[in-house]
Amino acid sequence: MSVLEVVLYPDEGLAKVCEPVAQVDDELNQFIDDMFDTMYEHEGIGLAAPQVGVLKRVITIDIEGDKTNQVVLINPEILESCGETGIEEGCLSIPGHRALVPRKEKVKVKALNRKGEEVIYEADGLFAICIQHEIDHLNGVLFVDHISALKRQRIKEKMQKLKKQIERAK
């Protein structure tokens, strides 16, 4: 298991639509373990594969962060959604920035688990918000795409400066 490098906004890979996973195997499960390690290392509650540079439809979630309720969604698809909600969201690919994002209050999602079995989750609250946020990543959408162009541009400029600082420090 290892911690992977998190891709930072405005990296072009974060704006790409991910390919479905064709086969759930040992290699994918190792990658999922690495995704969880990365998510915990950065104190996140969700992580999508494109955030670590892999354009596949894989999500890891652990709302509590205690490793007892790990959720893996492979090729997730929202079947139903209802209600309106929203919270200030953050993102491991956009550290230090948050914004209020409108979301559905409840979602029903179908996916494969890490054994390749079909699972269905009926989620609400933070779990539903996290699912929507991570599925957005799989579709090349970030939380900043839900905010005004001016705010998005300010965040983009700050993130470009941060990326330059990180590159110089290497």
From Swiss-Prot:
What cofactors are annotated for this protein?
Fe(2+)
User: Which BP terms from GO are recorded?
Assistant: co-translational protein modification; translation
EC category name: hydrolase
Reading the lineage from the top rank, the first entry is Bacteria
Question: Which amino acid positions bind Fe cation, per UniProt?
Answer: C91, H133, H137
E.C. no: 3.5.1.88
The record lists the catalysed reaction(s) as: N-terminal N-formyl-L-methionyl-[peptide] + H2O = N-terminal L-methionyl-[peptide] + formate
Which controlled-vocabulary keywords does the entry list?
Hydrolase, Iron, Metal-binding, Protein biosynthesis
**Cofactor binding comment, as recorded:** Binds 1 Fe(2+) ion.
Q: Where is the active site?
A: E134
Q: List the residue ranges forming a coiled coil, or say none.
A: none
Q: Name one Pfam family in it.
A: Pep_deformylase
Named from the GO MF annotations, one term is: metal ion binding
Has keyword Plastid? no
The protein's job, in short, is: Removes the formyl group from the N-terminal Met of newly synthesized proteins. Requires at least a dipeptide for an efficient rate of reaction. N-terminal L-methionine is a prerequisite for activity but the enzyme has broad specificity at other positions.
Q: Which family does it belong to?
A: Belongs to the polypeptide deformylase family.
Q: What is this protein called?
A: Peptide deformylase
| Source organism (scientific name) | Actinobacillus pleuropneumoniae serotype 7 (strain AP76)
